[in-house]
Structure formats: C-alpha cells, structure tokens
Amino acid sequence: MNEWLSQRADALARVTGVDRSALELSDEDAEHLLDLAAHAAHDSDARTNAPLLCYLVGVARTAGTPLDQLGETVRSTS
C-alpha cells in the first residue's frame, strides 16, 4: 500500500476503532479493486460508478466473501 493510502488507513482506524491490520490492502486486492473500478466505468459508461461499485463491494466483503468471488459476481451481471 502506498504512503498516501496508508496514512488514510491509519486515520480511518483511529476514528473507527477498526484494527489497522484489517485495513491492509494487498497488491492482489488492489488489482482486483482497480479492475472492478475499470469494469464499472467501461460497462456503465459512467466513471462515477467506479468508486460507488468499490464501496458496494467493500460493504459486501464484510460478510466474508472473497474479493475475487465478488468480482466474478459483479462481472456476471453485465
């Protein structure tokens, strides 16, 4: 995770009380999210859907479903 993103994760952990380690973003997860963001922007023809889809995936991820499975689900609805 780059420095800028790491600082935001630190701040979010402080404010929410979430364990900081839960906010770590692996390179693989970052790639999955960036791919999903690109998919949302291109598939919907609206760039604004990219961060919104990533938010929805993040909320869905709290149920414990792996990120790659969520990505497959999102892509299969296109």
What are these regions (language model features)?
Residues M1-S78:
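Feature captures hydrophobic
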